[in-house]
Structures are given as C-alpha cells and as structure tokens.
C-alpha cells in the first residue's frame, strides 16, 4: 500500500494548485477568514431554515423563541466547542489558561459544540416553559448547514486531511507529513454530515410524521451523524497528539459512540411518547 501511495504522488492533486486561501478578505488591519464566515453562514442559514420549520402546524416554539435561540446556540457552539477541544484533544493548553480564549488560533470540537447547543436549548426551553426535546428535533434539522460549511472551511484551510491513499482523487496537502497523497476527508464529511444527513432529516420532517413524535428527529440526527463520523474517521488522519487510542478507536470515534447509543434510544422510544396533534 505504501509503495502504491508513493507511486501515485506524481498524479495526485496538489491542494496548493487549487488557489485556495484561508483568508477571505484582507484589509490590512483586519483579516476575515473563511472559517469565521463558515460559522456565520451556518448559524444564519440554520436560523432561516428554523423559521420555516416552526411556521408549520404544531411547532414547539414561536418566532421570538427562535430568535433568542440563535444567541444561546452561538454561545453554546463557541464555549462548548472550545472547552471540549481543550479537554479531549489538547489538554496542554490548560498550562496557559488564557490560550483557551484564543479561538482565532483554531481548535474546536463538534461534540463539545453540540453539548453547548443542547445546554442552550435546555436553558431557553425551561425559561419559557417549552418542550426541550421537541426543540431539539427542530434544531437538529438545521445543524447540517453548519456541518457542511465547517467541513468546507476545513478543506479551504488545508487542515484535518485524510490518511495516505492511492485513489485517483487523492490530494497532497502542504502541512501533511511526508508529502504523501491523502484522502480529502474534509469533503467526505461535508457530503455525509452536511448534504446526505440534511436531506435525510428534510425527508423525515416534511414527508413523514416524525416531527410529531418527540425525540425522533434528533435521534435520527445523532444516529446519522454518528455513523457518518465513525466511518469517515477510518479515512481521516488521527490527531497527531493522540493518534489511535489504546482501544483501537480515534478520539472522534470514541466521542461518537454515546451519540450512536443515544440516537438509537430516542428513535426506538419515540413512539412511546405522547404524540403531538399538528392540527
């Protein structure tokens, strides 16, 4: 396999030849990165789609709640995503506590961001006397927007590349060790976690009665994301500071296992919860 990868290096696509630049706009005194725009785009499109979802009969919240939720979700993404990255992926940052605040240096965890959003939903729901589980159902349908743009931004940044491979679409990333052709795993994740999962959730929301079964849509999201992430991790290069863990899984796969279990549970038990009358 290693010899085949090396032999394929001459035909591999070079990321540097694509003309990509992590900086979207450079004003001299201010640089706007594609990664920042990805977060903003994901949040705004997610909010817009959420307003369409809650316009349907039987929605668990009003428009004003959706507007408030954007604030809590954004805080949850930033705080949860950063803290989880520090604790699970880069604990050495804790030796310099102020570095935890340096979000512009990169380092966010989806699993932590998801927990942060869940905490924000729970707080907002309790504060307004709403069903936190049903709000999760609706928000889950919007999450693929952020996942898609986030992974595309990873690709534009030339980071989180895949494992060495000899496939015809292999790419050479400038920061990858050994200069070997690798899977563009960022695009795999964008396709599975963003496009495919988004279409699946859209089908279940608009074409079935799933939105009236509390917990079913968020269960589908957890299961769909979990399966996508678990599989793509076999094509994605493990984090250099962690590698493959002693039990044979990467950290990403390990953190995904609870999502798979939770998703299966929510789907299996959705029919046992009180159905919502959408009339």
Swiss-Prot record:
The keyword Iron-sulfur does not apply. InterPro entries: Lgt. It is found in: Cell inner membrane. Pathway: Protein modification; lipoprotein biosynthesis (diacylglyceryl transfer). Signal peptide: none annotated. Pfam families: LGT (PF01790). One of its GO terms (molecular function) is phosphatidylglycerol-prolipoprotein diacylglyceryl transferase activity. One of its GO terms (cellular component) is plasma membrane. Its EC number is 2.5.1.145. Keywords: Cell inner membrane, Cell membrane, Membrane, Transferase, Transmembrane, Transmembrane helix. One of its GO terms (biological process) is lipoprotein biosynthetic process. The chain crosses the membrane at residues 27-47, 69-89, 103-123, 138-158, 186-206, 215-235, 247-267. Catalyzes the transfer of the diacylglyceryl group from phosphatidylglycerol to the sulfhydryl group of the N-terminal cysteine of a prolipoprotein, the first step in the formation of mature lipoproteins. This is Phosphatidylglycerol--prolipoprotein diacylglyceryl transferase. It comes from Rhizorhabdus wittichii (strain DSM 6014 / CCUG 31198 / JCM 15750 / NBRC 105917 / EY 4224 / RW1) (Sphingomonas wittichii). The lineage of its organism: Bacteria, Pseudomonadati, Pseudomonadota, Alphaproteobacteria, Sphingomonadales. The gene is lgt.
